[in-house]
Amino acid sequence: MNWLDTVRWDDKGLVPVIAQEAASGDVLMFAWMNREALQKTAELGQAVYFSRSRGRLWHKGEESGHLQTVHEIRLDCDSDVVLLKVTQLGHEPGIACHTGRHSCFFSLYKDGQWVATEPVLKDPASIYK
């Protein structure tokens, strides 16, 4: 059996993916992969996702330069979620979020509202031209 056949793909042929920074353990982002994206990620050693809005593969950092070097690819106990342990490249600290922040999980629920807890490290307008 091919290693990709072990993954429990959803009815659209996708699997959810969490990118975690290998050094710090920070959760950077959530995305989706199809079979081709997961295979390319394993081959290249860089994160390649499937963009549902664009309907195509998305090599993380292709526009921004904020690539993700993949150190480990893990599959959860139900074989339906992938975890990538990555090094976020392109800025120090790494910028994983399109808002110019380190992590996409910068909003904290506190006292009945969402509060931004991470600074914008780089203006998105200067990242995506």
From Swiss-Prot:
Localization of this protein: Cytoplasm
Keyword Transcription carried by entry: no
Recorded GO MF terms: magnesium ion binding; phosphoribosyl-AMP cyclohydrolase activity; zinc ion binding
Entry protein name: Phosphoribosyl-AMP cyclohydrolase
Entry similarity comment: Belongs to the PRA-CH family.
Keyword Transferase: no
Reaction it catalyzes: 1-(5-phospho-beta-D-ribosyl)-5'-AMP + H2O = 1-(5-phospho-beta-D-ribosyl)-5-[(5-phospho-beta-D-ribosylamino)methylideneamino]imidazole-4-carboxamide
Protein task: Catalyzes the hydrolysis of the adenine ring of phosphoribosyl-AMP.
Free-text remark on how the cofactor is bound: Binds 1 Mg(2+) ion per subunit. Binds 1 zinc ion per subunit.
Record's GO cellular component terms: cytoplasm
UniProtKB keywords: Amino-acid biosynthesis, Cytoplasm, Histidine biosynthesis, Hydrolase, Magnesium, Metal-binding, Zinc
PANTHER family: HISTIDINE BIOSYNTHESIS BIFUNCTIONAL PROTEIN (PTHR42945), HISTIDINE BIOSYNTHESIS BIFUNCTIONAL PROTEIN HIS7 (PTHR42945:SF1)
Pathway listed: Amino-acid biosynthesis; L-histidine biosynthesis; L-histidine from 5-phospho-alpha-D-ribose 1-diphosphate: step 3/9
Location, primary (coarse class): cytoplasm
Assembly description: Homodimer.
Gene3D superfamilies membership: Phosphoribosyl-AMP cyclohydrolase (3.10.20.810)
InterPro entries: PRA-CH, PRib_AMP_CycHydrolase_dom, PRib_AMP_CycHydrolase_sf
Residue numbers binding Mg(2+): 76, 78, 80
Cofactor(s) the protein requires to work: Mg(2+); Zn(2+)
Source organism (scientific name): Polaromonas naphthalenivorans (strain CJ2)
Binding-site residues for Zn(2+), renumbered to this chain: 77, 97, 104
EC class of the enzyme, as a word: hydrolase
EC code(s) of this entry: 3.5.4.19
Signal peptide bounds: none
Record-level GO BP terms: L-histidine biosynthetic process
